[in-house]
């Protein structure tokens, strides 16, 4: 039977243990390979300050690489009587290497250990989310260019308003995603700082080389103040959650639009049959369940920052077990958002648009502004032109001229998709993911 890392000469009540461990074993599986990476950097540093011999380091690194491979294969498990991922990794090392395995925790607490695990996990997941956002962005830009000349009604207050285009609609969500990358980039930069060496939040009497572990793990810098490093637990997750929520907000709005435009009363877009579901009683139904679930899941993600903030609310300086609860809402959120992004990209790619919407005369009044502007450009005062066209609409004598000429930046005739593409490319390049990727690869090859 495994012993707890903190175990004393008394037995813990099983119900207390069940309650305090909670779902930690399950959640810690997300962190397993990052716990290994953090340990590899930590023990390399320990050898450099004389707390491990070169021979001990070599044996530990070899075994940690084996454990990392087990994690990559999805075979890593936390045994029933083992408390968490940190205990499991140390137990596996001790079983293989004896007392050498017990040395890896010198100069480290589970507090800074889980902090570095969370940061390594999060920066990997942020990288993957950014990649999936880019895939959806590319689909939206492609559709925007494809349908840039196809007009559709624009709405305000859910009333027919002015001419828009499918080029504008698809392009608007592409630009929204480009802006969302700024929030994700800011969250990444705050995440990509090394907490190792802060121990339980008050540092260590060992002469730890924190810059060395920072470099080994590819962090941009470190959380310098050891007290602040511990205070960052929860704050980091909340900041990242806000960035995820921002992306989710774009998805939720887009999904709502798509559901509306797909319904028979609008008929602006059509989803392929394979992208819909049916009814058990109504044989004609083709429901946009994918977009409905994207909307619901995205709305759930938008509540994530508030959940984390409330768990952290009024906690003083230092570690508290409350923070364990953040794992349960934070760690799975990346899978949820990734799934939504993948489904959105797939269904946008398959979406067909109705190129003949404006054949319906019910949409003619939306060209009234075009007529007002034409009269004003010819010299009639704008208010007089507005009144004249309004009276024609009331009298039923208004005749819509559907040949519109919008040329300014970002309008129907000048989408500026090249500028939006450049914006996304600049925002993606600002992450500098390659530094972390190269550091991890190098660490694993030591």
List the predicted regions and their residue ranges:
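A helix-coil-helix interface module used to build multimeric assemblies
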Residues: 2-203, 208-214, 221, 277-278, ...
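Glycine-rich cofactor/substrate-binding loops
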Residues: 2-38, 99-100, 282-446
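A general structural motif at alpha-helix termini
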Residues: 60-61, 217, 273-275, 362, ...
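Short alpha-helical "patches" and their helix-cap loops
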Residues: 55-60, 135, 184, 261-265, ...
């Amino acid at each position: 039977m495994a012993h707890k890392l903190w175990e004393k000469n008394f037995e813990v009540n099983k119900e207390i243990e069940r309650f305090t461990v909670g779902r930690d074993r399950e959640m810690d599986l997300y962190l397993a390979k990052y716990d290994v990476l953090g340990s590899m950097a930590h023990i390399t540093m320990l050898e450099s300050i004389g707390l491990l011999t070169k021979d001990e380091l070599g044996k530990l690194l070899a075994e940690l690489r084996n454990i990392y491979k087990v994690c990559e294969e999805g075979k890593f498990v936390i045994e029933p009587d083992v408390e968490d991922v940190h205990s499991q990794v140390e137990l596996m090392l001790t079983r293989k290497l004896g007392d050498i395995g017990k040395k890896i925790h010198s100069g480290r607490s589970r507090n800074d250990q889980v902090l570095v695990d969370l940061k390594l996990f999060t920066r990997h997941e942020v990288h993957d989310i950014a990649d999936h956002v880019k895939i959806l962005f590319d689909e939206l830009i492609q559709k925007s260019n494809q349908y840039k000349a196809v007009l559709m009604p624009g709405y305000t207050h859910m009333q027919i308003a002015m001419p828009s285009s499918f080029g504008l609609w698809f392009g608007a969500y592409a630009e929204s995603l480009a802006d969302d990358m700024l929030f994700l980039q800011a969250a990444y930069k705050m995440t990509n700082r090394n907490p190792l060496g802060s121990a339980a939040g008050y540092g260590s009497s060992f002469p730890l080389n924190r810059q060395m572990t920072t470099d080994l793990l590819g962090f941009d810098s470190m959380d310098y103040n050891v007290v602040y490093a511990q205070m960052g637990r929860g704050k980091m997750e909340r900041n990242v959650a806000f960035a995820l929520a921002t992306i989710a907000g774009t998805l939720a709005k887009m999904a709502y639009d798509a559901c509306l435009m797909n319904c028979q009363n609008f008929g602006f877009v059509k989803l392929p049959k394979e992208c819909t579901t049916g009814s058990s009683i109504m044989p004609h139904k083709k429901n946009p369940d994918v977009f409905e679930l994207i909307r619901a899941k995205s709305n759930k993600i938008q509540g994530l920052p508030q959940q984390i903030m409330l768990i952290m609310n009024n906690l003083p300086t230092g570690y508290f077990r409350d923070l364990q609860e953040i794992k349960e809402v934070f760690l799975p959120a990346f899978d949820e958002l990734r799934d939504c992004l993948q489904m959105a990209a797939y269904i946008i790619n398959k979406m067909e648009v109705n190129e003949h919407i404006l054949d319906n005369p019910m949409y003619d009044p939306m060209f009234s502004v075009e007529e007002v502007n034409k009269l004003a450009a010819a010299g009639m005062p704008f208010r007089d032109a507005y009144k004249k066209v309004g009276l024609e609409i009331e009298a039923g004598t208004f005749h819509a001229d559907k040949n519109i000429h919008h040329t300014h930046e970002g309008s129907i005739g000048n989408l500026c998709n090249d500028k939006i593409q450049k914006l996304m490319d600049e925002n993606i390049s600002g992450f500098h993911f390659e530094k972390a990727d190269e550091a991890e690869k190098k660490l694993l090859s030591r």
